[in-house]
């Protein structure tokens, strides 16, 4: 019994000893947790102290209004469509005025020049009759440089239209329609690139051919330049005919695959241009490119609408007259003419809004810079020269050839079931189209003249110029990447640890005191400094911007 009692006593003593040893371990764990929580709170407090120190430092004083600037940028993105569409509307109307010039004013001037030449010939013939037949002087009429330009342009347009009128557009339509979606995507891309390359080449070629020096060259050089220009206009017109038929297929397809493909190509412009660094010249050039793109889309869709309207009217003539009603006819006509424009041009407008809004945001540009573009286009239009056409890079002769080739069969097919003779019907349709174009040109000129007077009065009161200053930019740091680097960080990144011009910064810690020498001499200029130096070096550089001129890193 005594042995059992001693064993039980030993076990009890061991348990008590274990309890005593376990109690301090729990206390130790709690104390360690306390230390961790205190370290965490000290870290949070330290971050708060650092933020308070940063807010009170001199480096933060320049960025104290950064929130206001960010709010201004958001408001500018909302205001961009108003400024952009005002510029676009004026530029598109002036482009349409230049386009109608080839159908109205140019033929009138050509006829006037030939009438003047005929009158001089008749006057010379009468003088020869009065003086007798003894001293015969051969008749020589020296044409002016303007008459030479007009005759060359009419000759090129007429011959190119005759050559391209031999194309069977229905065969081209079905040949393109049979292709797969991937091939059509490649076709759209190739035609777009070919259009830009030919437009750039044609602008230089036509400028040389229509120059004043060319009218004084020998006949061989003149014929060579005219033949080269004729070849260019014919090839460019052929490319534009392919573009018009491809767009017609995409718009008229029963499935939305081709139209979706076309819209996706438009939205691809955002990816290629938004996340880029722009200067004022590049921004003006991409705005001009958007004007040309929208004008070309409107022209191609107008041709598509006229061809669809002609095919619908021919199918309507084969049906019974009992199914016709004015309300249904008007709705069908509106659907044919306005349906493609709403989908394609509407998406183009939305893409332009988003693209310009983000370009101005990333490059910290205020929308008032569109007034500079607006004023430059107004000055080009008011001079009544080809400067506007050269700045915009509009291939108007190729557009005129495209319109004649695609619309001429439509107009004459619509008048086929007529009792009039064929020649008289052609003359009647030609005269009707000419009078309508002349009326549109006259109305458009009145609108633009009135608009130009308002622009002149507005900018005269403000003493406006095309110089871009710091007022056209939102204050703040520009960045080539996704983040921003302030001045002190840039100095630290580009420090050279030299002895000259060093800046000593001390960071005191409880353990030790450390000195770091930073050099501001070797720090390269920031993006803001580069832009400021470039603007001050050439303040009126916007006036030298053209569509196909390398004024920035690339041509848009």
Swiss-Prot record:
Subunit note: Interacts with SLP1.
Chain ranges passing through the membrane: 88-108, 152-172, 225-245, 331-351, 392-412, 429-449
Record membrane topology: Multi-pass membrane protein
GO biological process, one term: protein folding in endoplasmic reticulum
Gene: EMP65
Cellular component per GO, a single term: endoplasmic reticulum membrane
Protein's recorded name: Endoplasmic reticulum membrane protein 65
Modified residues (Phosphoserine): 22
Record's keyword terms, sorted: Endoplasmic reticulum, Glycoprotein, Membrane, Mitochondrion, Phosphoprotein, Transmembrane, Transmembrane helix
Domain of life: Eukaryota
Residue ranges that the UniProt entry lists as topological domain Cytoplasmic: 1-87, 173-224, 352-391, 450-556
Lumenal topological segments: 109-151, 246-330, 413-428
Sites where a glycan is attached: 318
Family: Belongs to the TAPT1 family.
Functional note: May be involved in membrane protein folding.
Localization terms from the record: Endoplasmic reticulum membrane; Mitochondrion
């Amino acid at each position: 019994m005594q042995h059992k009692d001693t064993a039980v006593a030993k076990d009890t003593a061991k348990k008590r000893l274990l309890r005593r040893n376990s109690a301090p371990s729990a206390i130790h764990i709690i104390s360690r947790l306390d230390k961790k929580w205190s370290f965490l709170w000290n870290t949070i407090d330290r971050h708060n102290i650092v933020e308070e120190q940063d807010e009170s430092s001199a480096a933060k004083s320049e960025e104290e209004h950064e929130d206001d600037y960010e709010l201004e940028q958001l408001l500018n993105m909302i205001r961009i469509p108003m400024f952009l569409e005002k510029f676009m509307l004026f530029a598109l109307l002036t482009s349409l005025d230049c386009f109608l010039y080839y159908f109205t004013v140019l033929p009138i001037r050509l006829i006037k020049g030939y009438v003047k030449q005929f009158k001089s010939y008749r006057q010379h013939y009468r003088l020869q009759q009065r003086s007798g037949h003894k001293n015969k002087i051969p008749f020589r009429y020296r044409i002016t440089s303007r008459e030479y330009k007009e005759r060359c342009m009419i000759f090129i347009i007429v011959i190119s239209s005759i050559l391209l009128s031999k194309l069977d557009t229905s065969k081209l339509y079905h040949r393109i329609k049979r292709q797969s979606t991937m091939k059509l995507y490649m076709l759209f891309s190739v035609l777009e690139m070919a259009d830009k390359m030919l437009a750039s080449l044609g602008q230089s070629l036509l400028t040389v051919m229509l120059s004043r020096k060319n009218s004084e060259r020998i006949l061989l050089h003149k014929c060579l330049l005219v033949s080269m220009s004729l070849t260019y206009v014919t090839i460019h017109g052929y490319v534009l005919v392919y573009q018009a038929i491809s767009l017609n297929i995409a718009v008229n397809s029963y499935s939305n695959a081709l139209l979706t493909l076309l819209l996706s190509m438009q939205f691809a412009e955002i990816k290629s241009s938004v996340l880029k660094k722009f200067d004022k010249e590049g921004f003006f050039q991409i705005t001009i490119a958007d004007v040309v793109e929208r004008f070309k889309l409107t022209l191609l869709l107008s041709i598509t609408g006229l061809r669809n309207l002609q095919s619908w009217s021919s199918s309507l003539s084969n049906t019974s007259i009992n199914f016709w009603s004015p309300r249904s006819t008007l709705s069908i006509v509106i659907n044919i003419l306005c349906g493609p424009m709403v989908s394609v041009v509407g998406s183009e407008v939305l893409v332009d809004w988003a693209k310009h809004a983000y370009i101005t945001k990333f490059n910290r540009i205020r929308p008032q810079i569109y007034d500079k573009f607006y004023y430059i286009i107004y000055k080009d239009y008011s001079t009544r020269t080809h400067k506007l056409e050269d700045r915009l890079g509009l291939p108007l002769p190729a557009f005129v050839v495209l319109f004649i080739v695609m619309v001429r069969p439509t107009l004459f097919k619509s008048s086929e079931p007529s009792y009039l003779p064929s020649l008289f019907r052609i003359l009647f349709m030609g005269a009707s189209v000419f009078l309508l174009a002349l009326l549109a040109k006259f109305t458009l000129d009145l609108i633009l003249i009135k608009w130009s007077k308002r622009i002149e009065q507005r900018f005269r009161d403000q003493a406006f110029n095309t110089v871009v200053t710091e007022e056209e930019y939102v204050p703040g740091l520009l960045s080539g990447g996704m983040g921003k680097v302030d001045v002190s960080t840039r100095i630290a990144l580009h420090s050279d640890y030299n002895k000259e011009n060093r800046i000593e910064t001390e960071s005191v810690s409880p353990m030790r005191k450390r000195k770091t020498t930073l050099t501001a001499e070797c720090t390269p200029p920031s993006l803001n400094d580069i832009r400021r130096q470039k603007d001050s070096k050439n303040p009126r550089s916007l006036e030298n911007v053209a569509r196909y001129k390398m004024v920035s890193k690339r041509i848009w």
